[in-house]
Amino acid sequence: MQTVFSFLLAALLHEGGHYAAWLFGGGKKNNGGASFRFGYAGAELRVPPSGSYRAALAVQLAGPAANLLTALVTLFFPGDFPRLLREQSLLLGGLQMLPIRGLDGGGALEATAALLWGERAAYRLPAVTSWLCLTALWLLSCCLLLLGSGNLSFFVLSFWLLCRQVRR
């Protein structure tokens, strides 16, 4: 039960980081667009576009930053729950920073590419990095399964993310 609760708390803190950055960047709580939900893929916060690539970049990076901050704070607390929360936070924040469309890293890459090279690069670069990362993750999960040292959940996650990319 502690594992489930620690993951839910890590996800809430992650999404809270996004929300705080959105509010700090000028977003309004009641502007008719911010919504939070738990879905089959985890927690999701939807906020209206800010109109600024810098603000979008800050919002994208704020979730993983909240996970990193959570992990650092839990270093000072003994026990199983802080350790679980630290591990879950680092896992969630690290996974979200992969440069894959639909994850925070993909959104951050898109905003950065738009700032540096324009709209065309903002569309193309995340598409390429998504395919490269997802293919590498899926191949790694297949190899680990075949060698007997992998786990099925990593294979399912990488396959699910790859299928999501195919649908885009």
For each feature predicted by the language model, list its residue ranges:
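Hydrophobic alpha-helical transmembrane segments
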Residues: 1, 73-79, 139-147
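Small-residue-rich helix-interface/hinge motifs
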Residues: 2-56, 87-88, 98
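Hydrophobic core segments of alpha-helical transmembrane domains in multi-pass membrane proteins
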Residues: 3-11, 83-94, 147-163
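Divalent metal-coordination and catalytic microenvironments
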Residues: 9, 14, 63, 96, ...
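Active-site-flanking alpha-helical
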Residues: 17-26, 70, 74, 111-113
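Juxtamembrane/interfacial segments flanking transmembrane helices
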Residues: 34-36, 97-116
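Core segments of transmembrane alpha-helices
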Residues: 62-73, 129-139
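C-terminal transmembrane module of polytopic alpha-helical membrane proteins
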Residues: 112-168
